[in-house]
Amino acid sequence: MQSSVLQSIGKTPILKLKLSKDLPGTVWLKLENQNPGGSIKDRVAFHCLERAVKRGELRDRMVAATSGNLGIGCALVCAAWGLECFLTMPESMSDERKALLRGFGAQLRLTPAAAGMGGAVEEAKRLA
């Protein structure tokens, strides 16, 4: 049994796939969608935030712009560590994505869709 959801990051199943009897070789699949946040970006978020904490660059809150999976990974890690997570994103992102981020405890600041990710990045810089 794991004591933290973070311990399951990266410990995803590996499947052996034989594409066809006519094709030699084997394809191996690592099912990164089985990470707790649903993507390989959980690994990136964990290692980046862990490094920032070890360097003393991150103490109690993080601010970042996101369009999705990396933000979900960051929100997951922050929730597990008790850090505040402020994310900026274009208002055009799906309601499901916004709900998932909020479910992990992230505070969202939505930026105008017309400004795209550039607008979200500028807002994150302003908040940081």
Write out the residue ranges for each language-model feature.
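PLP-dependent amino-acid enzyme catalytic core
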Residues: 1-128
